[in-house]
């Protein structure tokens, strides 16, 4: 029994720098049913597997992480409880998906972003409403809200029925560099978390929003598999740096390139 536990712990340590392939909100509480009208649940059509979350940015477009992609995606809007859906829940499928050059051309620190065009627009309702894109970048020290249906444990996959939310802080990029030495000197990501540990996104939360001082600023991308671990914050794709790309794609300019 002791040997099994030791081996399990070694496996967790080996995964400690793994990408949050489909990323929990560790240390959070159930979200208020009215605070996440823009939050989208993503599923693989073929397998039915939950892939993570996205953010509705207008009636026809969803923004999420590139690594949440599957060949055909089902998107659910107005969802809180998976078992007892809201009456105004709407379901769509992906019509087109847009990436920075290629759906494989992303790294932990660059281009982990995907725009999904829906097969038809969603309608605003009591539990569905788009979230605006940012007009300015966030400031270090900002209080940021994270949310998602990700696992509630970093040692086993326990996906909740309802989304969980937590408040974390926007940190200096150097805090992520200290935790993850492979990070470059600069990247188009945000570093966010609680340095003392205890609150974090985790497996199943990928693609969900980072909302700082009420503004959509980041997309949950990756971090330590030991979710909520001391001095191991999360990395979030910086939405503001990709505004031109996002707006150009939506306007029909599909030849636009992402920022370097």
Swiss-Prot record:
Signal peptide: 1-18
SS bond list: 31-165, 100-258, 144-212, 176-191, 202-227
Classification via InterPro entries: Peptidase_S1_PA, Peptidase_S1_PA_chymotrypsin, Peptidase_S1A, Trypsin_dom, TRYPSIN_HIS, TRYPSIN_SER
EC number(s) given by UniProt: 3.4.21.-
PROSITE patterns given in the database record: TRYPSIN_DOM, TRYPSIN_HIS, TRYPSIN_SER
Residues covered by the Peptidase S1 domain: 25-251
Keyword Transmembrane: no
Gene Ontology CC annotation, any one: extracellular region
Major subcellular location class: secreted
Tissue and organ expression note: Expressed by the venom gland.
Localization annotation: Secreted
GO biological process, one term: proteolysis
Glycosylation sites: 105, 172, 213, 255
Keywords: Disulfide bond, Glycoprotein, Hemostasis impairing toxin, Hydrolase, Protease, Secreted, Serine protease, Signal, Toxin, Zymogen
Active site: 67 (charge relay system), 112 (charge relay system), 206 (charge relay system)
Annotated GO MF terms: serine-type endopeptidase activity; toxin activity
Propeptide: 19-24
Family: Belongs to the peptidase S1 family. Snake venom subfamily.
PANTHER family, per the entry: KALLIKREIN-1 (PTHR24271:SF47), KALLIKREIN-RELATED (PTHR24271)
Subunit details: Monomer.
Task of the protein: Snake venom serine protease that may act in the hemostasis system of the prey.
Protein name: Snake venom serine protease KN6
Taxon lineage: Eukaryota, Metazoa, Chordata, Craniata, Vertebrata
């Amino acid at each position: 029994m002791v040997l099994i536990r030791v081996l399990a712990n070694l496996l967790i340590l080996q995964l400690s720098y793994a990408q949050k392939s489909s990323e929990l909100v560790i240390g959070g509480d159930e979200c208020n049913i009215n605070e996440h009208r823009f939050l989208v649940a993503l599923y693989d059509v073929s397998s039915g597997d939950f892939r993570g979350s996205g953010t509705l940015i207008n009636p026809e477009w969803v923004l999420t992480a590139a690594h949440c992609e599957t060949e055909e995606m089902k998107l659910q809007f107005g969802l809180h409880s998976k078992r007892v859906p809201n009456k105004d829940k709407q379901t769509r499928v992906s019509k087109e998906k847009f990436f920075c050059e290629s759906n494989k051309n992303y790294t932990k620190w660059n281009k982990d972003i995907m725009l999904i065009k829906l097969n038809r627009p969603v309608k605003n309702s009591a539990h569905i409403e788009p979230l605006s894109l940012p007009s300015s970048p966030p400031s270090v020290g900002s209080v940021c809200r994270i949310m998602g249906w990700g696992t509630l444990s970093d040692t086993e996959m326990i996906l909740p029925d309802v989304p969980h939310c937590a408040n974390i802080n926007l940190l200096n990029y150097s805090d992520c560099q200290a935790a993850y030495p492979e990070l470059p000197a600069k990247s188009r990501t945000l570093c966010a978390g609680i340095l003392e540990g205890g609150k974090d996104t985790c497996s199943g939360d990928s693609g969900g929003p980072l909302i700082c001082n009420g503004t959509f600023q980041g997309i949950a991308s990756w971090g330590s598999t030991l979710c909520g671990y001391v001095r191991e914050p999360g990395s979030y794709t910086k939405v503001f740096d990709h505004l031109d790309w996002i707006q150009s794609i939506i306007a029909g300019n599909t030849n636009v390139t992402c920022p370097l």
